[in-house]
Amino acid sequence: MSDNTVKIKKQTIDPTLTLEDVKKQLIEKGKKEGHLSHEEIAEKLQNFDIDSDQMDDFFDQLNDNDISLVNEKDSSDTDEKLNPSDLSAPPGVKINDPVRMYLKEIGRVNLLSAQEEIELAKRIEQGDEVAKSRLAEANLRLVVSIAKRYVGRGMLFLDLIQEGNMGLIKAVEKFDFNKGFKFSTYATWWIRQAITRAIADQARTIRIPVHMVETINKLIRVQRQLLQDLGRDPAPEEIGEEMDLPAEKVREILKIAQEPVSLETPIGEEDDSHLGDFIEDQEAQSPSDHAAYELLKEQLEDVLDTLTDREENVLRLRFGLDDGRTRTLEEVGKVFGVTRERIRQIEAKALRKLRHPSRSKRLKDFMD
């Protein structure tokens, strides 16, 4: 089977094919060879958004055509035996005590024989919750084995296991032993589906809808294929032609597919700087503007000091020089206990004084 395995992994899926097209191809191949590998099915269908009814329909089609499902490592349809290494941490992944305890705990659960699976499935059909729990517990290590393959895609190892367990529960609820498939074969699809869906929903900082993730994956496949064919990066127009999309839509999808970069990303050989240090704050004052503003404040204070206390305070309130809030003549009049007209007169006199060349020349340079 190893030769076939290599051939399968080297095959390029036409990115323009629909879900039904890919399913038909798989069924045709299964008819010729009498079986399909579970890994091949997962690889071909992983980029499509498939609901439970569609997947059950596909399994029914395989059963109707007498196509058996096998493991890629072993073309016989025997029970899958997980190695002790399947319960170890993935390379480069540190696990904490709760995860270590969980892996140790599920390692103590005995695996089921094919006959035991059938007996439990029969009891589950009768609504036996204990049988449902037993079937799920016996396959928890299968979830760990599959979750390890998705490490490094934006989710923690424990989160991958938890999502896979949700898929396992769904498989337990939907498993039909009458179709002739082993439970592990049936459950593997649902575990993979749950994990890949979670990665699409949760792994990104900015969530992208699953249907858009499928479109992005399709675009990436087209992009890679064109890169091989053309020997260069394809233009949006070329990608759009293959996908039957306008170039502007391709650019929009490529923009959505971009991953955000943290402003705390280390920069430099010694990681002593961060990306945010080199990004301009367009809302902040430039150093020259800030310096000019401070000089203006100093000059204005000096000029105001040449007025009487009442004139200075009236201007400060009228123009909001202290707190940025301007006041009406009436509001200022209430502060000083005089009429609006009197405040207007005081203000006019103060402004005339400021317009005198001896004072105005000190502020004129700031008028440009």
Curated annotation (Swiss-Prot):
Residues annotated to bind DNA: 329-348
Annotated Pfam families: Sigma70_r1_1 (PF03979), Sigma70_r1_2 (PF00140), Sigma70_r2 (PF04542), Sigma70_r3 (PF04539), Sigma70_r4 (PF04545)
UniProt-recorded name of the protein: RNA polymerase sigma factor SigA
UniProt xrefs under PANTHER family: RNA POLYMERASE SIGMA FACTOR RPO (PTHR30603), RNA POLYMERASE SIGMA FACTOR RPOD (PTHR30603:SF60)
Location of the motif Interaction with polymerase core subunit RpoC: 159-162
Database matches in SUPFAM superfamilies: Sigma2 domain of RNA polymerase sigma factors, Sigma3 and sigma4 domains of RNA polymerase sigma factors
Recorded GO MF terms: DNA binding; sigma factor activity
Gene: sigA
Compositional bias (Basic and acidic residues): 71-83
Record-annotated disulphide pairs: none
Native species: Staphylococcus aureus (strain NCTC 8325 / PS 47)
UniProt superkingdom: Bacteria
Region span, Disordered: 69-90
Region annotation (Sigma-70 factor domain-2) ranges: 135-205
GO CC annotations, alphabetized: cytoplasm
Domain text: Contains 4 domains, connected by flexible linkers. In the active conformation, the domains are in an extended conformation, each making extensive interactions with the RNA polymerase catalytic core.
Subunit description: Interacts transiently with the RNA polymerase catalytic core formed by RpoA, RpoB, RpoC and RpoZ (2 alpha, 1 beta, 1 beta' and 1 omega subunit) to form the RNA polymerase holoenzyme that can initiate transcription. Interacts (via sigma-70 factor domain 4) with the phage G1 protein gp67; this inhibits rRNA synthesis. Interaction with phage G1 protein gp67 does not inhibit transcription in general, but selectively inhibits transcription from promoters that require interaction of the RNA polymerase alpha subunit with DNA sequences upstream of the -35 promoter element.
UniProt cross-references to NCBIfam families, sorted A to Z: PRK09210.1 (NF006666), RpoD_Cterm (TIGR02393), sigma70-ECF (TIGR02937)
Annotated region described as Sigma-70 factor domain-4, given as residue ranges: 303-356
UniProt family annotation: Belongs to the sigma-70 factor family. RpoD/SigA subfamily.
Biological role stated in the UniProt entry: Sigma factors are initiation factors that promote the attachment of RNA polymerase to specific initiation sites and are then released. This sigma factor is the primary sigma factor during exponential growth.
CDD domains: Sigma70_r4
Compartment list: Cytoplasm
Region Sigma-70 factor domain-1, residue ranges: 16-90
